[in-house]
Amino acid sequence: MDGLWVKCKQCQQILLTKELEKNLKVCRCGYHFRMTAQERIVMLVDENSFIEWDRELVSKDPLQFPGYAQKIQKCQIETSMSEAITTGQGRICDIPVVLGVMDPRFIMASMGAVVGEKIVRAAERALKLRLPLVLFSASGGARMQEGVLSLMQMARTSAALTRLSKAGLPFFSVLTDPTTGGVTASFAMLGDLIIAEPGALIGFTGPRVIEQTIRQKLPEGFQRSEFLQKHGMVDIIIERPKMREQLAALLALHCGNSLEGVES
């Protein structure tokens, strides 16, 4: 977050950036600003417990899409990430987990071949290690610059999570602002427990497109996490300052048997 001050989009108050960051980027009015993947990992996992996987995987621009290679390179420099998701193993309140966190700064965390591959590998390692999988989604959907290779990741990630489910290992999906498009239509909505942050935009396509298509005015708060929880699409909404402790409690509740005998 650049600058000394930042304006809240909800209450319009001017906030001191350092104070906002101390409060995990949550305004006094409850508005949740977007976080980077690194900020979220630091917030969640026990100190020095996170080991990143597959950082060497990078997109090779398979379709030679104009400007795509330059955009990838620019995002890598600006974010210090190799791709739009960081995956690895860590501990949350001493509970071992496989963790994946998307970062919307990287081409809006769109899902291409590398993002899909990293999620599949994370699920496969969770299966091998007998650990729960936790994925934090924040995405604009499938990455158009990779065409059908991007769309394939919807099926690949879903298949990997099905194998995890058949093995009796839990997958917690945490939806943050925004979670849309092909990510919503695939792995993000397949969690054994679907968690969301307050006020997160969650849907397949944008509300303006829907209104233009059906020629009707959408209900207030449509596609926000509170609306989805009310209509059975989200199981629980957790405020960011409470995320670590409540996630640990839910993991302990759901993972007691599956974690027996796991080496830390």
Swiss-Prot record:
It is found in: Cytoplasm. This is Acetyl-coenzyme A carboxylase carboxyl transferase subunit beta. HAMAP family: AcetylCoA_CT_beta. Acetyl-CoA carboxylase is a heterohexamer composed of biotin carboxyl carrier protein (AccB), biotin carboxylase (AccC) and two subunits each of ACCase subunit alpha (AccA) and ACCase subunit beta (AccD). It catalyses: N(6)-carboxybiotinyl-L-lysyl-[protein] + acetyl-CoA = N(6)-biotinyl-L-lysyl-[protein] + malonyl-CoA. The keyword Nuclease does not apply. It comes from Heliobacterium modesticaldum (strain ATCC 51547 / Ice1). The gene is accD. It comes from the Bacteria. Its EC number is 2.1.3.15. PANTHER family: ACETYL-COENZYME A CARBOXYLASE CARBOXYL TRANSFERASE SUBUNIT BETA, CHLOROPLASTIC (PTHR42995:SF5).
